[in-house]
């Protein structure tokens, strides 16, 4: 149990997808204007990561990995296309559910919802799972932890952005300039977790 808690804390704080690896920056910067929208996208990314990583782990371990199906057969060259297909399918399901049950969030996310399918944070989570050879329970913990870490980062940035609307920011830094500075400072803060040994 201690191993899984350690893996979860590592995924959320120490190896944060957005602030340690800078993955998923397109949607991270574009949807961080309002906390409510950022929270909705964070939930969506957490859902997709939390399901895509374990599902892809099962497919990789039982089908694609060397000697998984037949002795001497290695289908790992199909990793990318398989992982992307699973992620795209999950995003389509999520899009249909949000359109049916949460139309306001669906409309607020707009074009960025389908872009989750090509969000490099999600593909990065799946790739790290393969690279680190996580088993199924570890992949569940890692997937949800990575998603929650990304959500924590985007909600924190959205909160800062909302506060900065009322701040006296120099004209040259308004918009993306101050956002990049804020993200850099947040990343420095998250770097302090890198010295923690779990």
Swiss-Prot record:
Its EC number is 7.2.1.1. GO terms for cellular component: Gram-negative-bacterium-type cell wall; plasma membrane. One of its GO terms (biological process) is sodium ion transport. It catalyses: a ubiquinone + n Na(+)(in) + NADH + H(+) = a ubiquinol + n Na(+)(out) + NAD(+). One of its GO terms (molecular function) is oxidoreductase activity, acting on NAD(P)H, quinone or similar compound as acceptor. Composed of six subunits; NqrA, NqrB, NqrC, NqrD, NqrE and NqrF. It is a multi-pass membrane protein. Its main location: membrane. This is Na(+)-translocating NADH-quinone reductase subunit E. Keywords: Cell inner membrane, Cell membrane, Ion transport, Membrane, NAD, Sodium, Sodium transport, Translocase, Transmembrane, Transmembrane helix, Transport, Ubiquinone. Belongs to the NqrDE/RnfAE family. It is an enzyme of class 7 (translocase). NQR complex catalyzes the reduction of ubiquinone-1 to ubiquinol by two successive reactions, coupled with the transport of Na(+) ions from the cytoplasm to the periplasm. NqrA to NqrE are probably involved in the second step, the conversion of ubisemiquinone to ubiquinol. The gene is nqrE. Pfam families: Rnf-Nqr. The chain crosses the membrane at residues 11-31, 35-55, 77-97, 110-130, 140-160, 176-196. It is found in: Cell inner membrane. It comes from Haemophilus influenzae (strain PittEE).
């Amino acid at each position: 149990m201690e191993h899984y808690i350690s893996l979860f804390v590592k995924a959320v704080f120490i190896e944060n997808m957005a602030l340690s690896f800078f993955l998923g920056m397109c949607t991270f910067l574009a949807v961080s204007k309002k906390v409510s929208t950022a929270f909705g996208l964070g939930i969506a990314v957490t859902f997709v990561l939390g399901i895509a990583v374990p599902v892809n782990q099962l497919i990789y371990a039982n089908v694609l990995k060397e000697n998984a199906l037949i002795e001497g057969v290695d289908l790992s060259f199909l990793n990318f296309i398989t992982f992307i297909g699973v992620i795209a399918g999950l995003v389509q399901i999520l899009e249909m559910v949000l359109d049916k049950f949460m139309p306001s969030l669906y409309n607020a996310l707009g074009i960025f919802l389908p872009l989750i399918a090509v969000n490099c944070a999600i593909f990065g989570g799946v790739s790290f799972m393969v690279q680190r050879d996580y088993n199924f329970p570890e992949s569940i913990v890692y997937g949800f932890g990575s998603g929650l870490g990304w959500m924590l980062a985007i909600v924190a940035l959205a909160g800062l952005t909302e506060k900065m609307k009322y701040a006296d920011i120099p004209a040259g830094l308004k918009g993306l300039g101050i956002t990049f500075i804020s993200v850099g400072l947040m990343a420095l803060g998250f770097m302090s977790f890198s010295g923690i040994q779990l």
